Structures are given as C-alpha cells and as structure tokens.
Amino acid sequence: IKEPIPGLDIPELVRYGKERNVGLVLWTLWNPLDKELDEILDVYEKWGIKGIKVDFMQRSDQYMVNFYERVGKAAMERKLLVDFHGSFKPSGLQKKYPNVMTFEGVLGLEHDKDSRDINPVHDLILPFTRMVAGPMDYTPGAVNNATAEDFYINFVHPISLGTRAHQAALYVVYESPLQMLADSPSNYYKAPEFASFISRIPTIWEDTKAITAKIGEQLVIARKNGKNWYLAGLTDWNARNIEVKLDFLEASKYKMEIFKDGVNADVYASDFKTEEVMVSKDELINITMAKGGGWAAILTPVE
C-alpha cells in the first residue's frame, strides 16, 4: 500500500484535486499499516494525501485498541484525518485526537448488498443506540431505492430499502464529521437534484433539537450550522404526517428548500419531489412521509 498500481499517478491526482478544492482520502487495510505505520504515513504525507480510511480491523482486543491509538497519534502528527471503518464503536478517541473523524461500528448501508436487515426500522433504531456512542460512518446516499415489496438483493448494483427522501434525511439525522456517498459516481450524475441537495448538508452542527422521536418508528430532528437550520424526518414502514412547530428558529422569515417523498413513493421508492416555500418561526408545518420514507429541508434566513 506504499506503491500505486502502474498507470495510477497519485501525486498528479492530488494536484488535480487541489486545483478544484478537493482533497484525497485513501482507503487502506489495517494489517500493512500496523506493520509499517510511520513509513506508510510518511509516503502518504509526501504525496499530499489528506487522510486515510482504515478497514477490516473487526476486533476489539487490547492489541487492536492500542492500534487505533497509534494510528490516531501518527496521523495527527502528519495532519491526516482518520476514518476507522470495519471498527468497534467509538469510546472517546476522537476527543484525544480530533483528526479521528468517525467510526463505522454499525450495520451500515453497504450490507444491503447481502441482507434485508438494513431497512427503515433499523435506521430508526440507530439514533437511540449506536449513535449515542459517537460519530457513525453509516455511509448513506443510495440512489437505487425500493419498497419492501420490490426489494431484492443485488451485490453488483446495490439497492436500499426505503425511499430516496429517506436517504436524503439520513445526512441530517446521522452524525459524522466525515460523511460518505455510498453509491457510484455514475448514479449521482443520473440524480443531479439528489446529489446537489445532499452536497449542501453540513457535517458538523452547532445545535440540535429533537422535535419528536420513537425508537424504531419515527423521528423529526432539527440541526443548526451557521445561520441555517436543517430539518429532517424519518419513518418506518408506516406512512406518516407529523406536525412540526418552527418555534426553534431565530429569524422571523426563512426560505425552506424541501426534498420529500413523491406522490408515488409508496410504490416507486425513488420518486421524490422538491419544493421551495417561505416560512416563519411561528408556523406549524406538516411533514408527510410515505412508508419507508423521509423528509429533509434546508432553512435559510431571509433578511
């Protein structure tokens, strides 16, 4: 993992990305890193890499816990961020080493390739369980979406259970300072409205309001970044209409850009609708979600 394959010029990719304000994070196996940690990270630093995603640890014995500590420290010394994939749940390492951004430690979206267990009910259990421990690299963002009736396991072209609006809402609900896009670039090119919307959702928050929540069933949450608020709802396999009072807002008027389930989302899970409305902080709004659905909005104050 210190030498790229022939034809792959990583320093050139770093240069190309830098011109476009994009940094590169390299995925790496844990075992080679364990054996040559300093040597490998020195190479990555020299290339201009911004961070590493370490994978397949799959253990939590003392040796492995020490490995996490070594990686966090060595990466910090080289100003590299770290994402521990294939990991145990966080236990505070990100407080000691702020360059440690996030951890998997969860049955995430990637397992839709081989299971029906990653579904809207599962998604609504995680905020009350795994997320309590710290940042969670669930890897949301599926573009191929299916109802419970239409879902089938497809390892080559994975499909998510629940609606596309459900996937959009996960970026607000799930906390991870380094968020992932789970799907292929080709699929995002085919879904520009979805890609554009989730690209505008921050990954760090100044304030959070739990509006309503019931484990495994439904929730609505509001988060703040700068002057903007981000509102999201999730539901299980039951369609819901939830009234939300916007009294948590500070300014009097906001532009609310909504990404929600389309009229046919209960039978075609990829169906969505976007709309833009003006709202005030004393308003009561309705969040309508299809079965397995979701709802997300960006609220920008209007001067």
Q: Where is each model-derived feature located?
A:
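Solvent-exposed beta-hairpin/edge-strand motifs
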Residues: 248-262
